[in-house]
Regions:
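Short Asp/Glu-rich motifs
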Residues: 40, 75-76, 117-118
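Short, mixed-charge, low-aromatic patches
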Residues: 6-12, 45-54, 65-72
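Extreme N-terminal segment that seeds HTH/winged-HTH DNA-binding domains in transcriptional regulators
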Residues: 1-31, 37, 81, 85-121
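N-terminal helix-turn-helix
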Residues: 31-63
Length: 121
């Protein structure tokens, strides 16, 4: 993962971890790798991983079980809300970009549909 020097690394990791949850890479109820393992994988200080994971827990997306480790929440409603938020963020970026290009809504949607069908179907 390439980090943006303009933003705190723990926030970038927080976004990465939320994406893993919202896309199902980290499933509801699944045990998350240890802080040390994640720090090694992302090549960052364990304290940075801990800070991102603590924020996930504060938001209710993970829970720590005293002797078992850290797990993704079983609350599927919360995960669904996270999926919605992730989609809205991407949609906002697309709409902002289309507006910056002075595209009409219908043209932007048609262009996206055509591009999707040509490149991703």
């Amino acid at each position: 993962m390439e980090f943006d020097n303009q933003r705190p690394i723990y926030l970038q990791l927080l976004e990465e971890f939320k994406l893993k949850i919202s896309t199902g890479q980290w499933q509801a109820g699944e045990k998350i790798d240890s802080v040390r393992s994640l720090a090694s994988f992302y090549e960052v200080n364990p304290n940075t991983i801990q800070k991102a994971l603590s924020e996930l827990e504060r938001e209710g997306l993970t829970e720590t079980r005293r002797t078992s480790g850290r797990f993704v929440t079983d609350n599927t409603s919360l995960i669904s809300d996270l999926e919605d938020d992730s989609f809205k963020k991407i949609a906002d970026e697309f709409i902002e970009g289309a507006k910056n290009l002075n595209l009409e809504k219908d043209k932007a949607i048609d262009d996206l549909r055509n591009y999707w069908e040509k490149n991703y179907d």
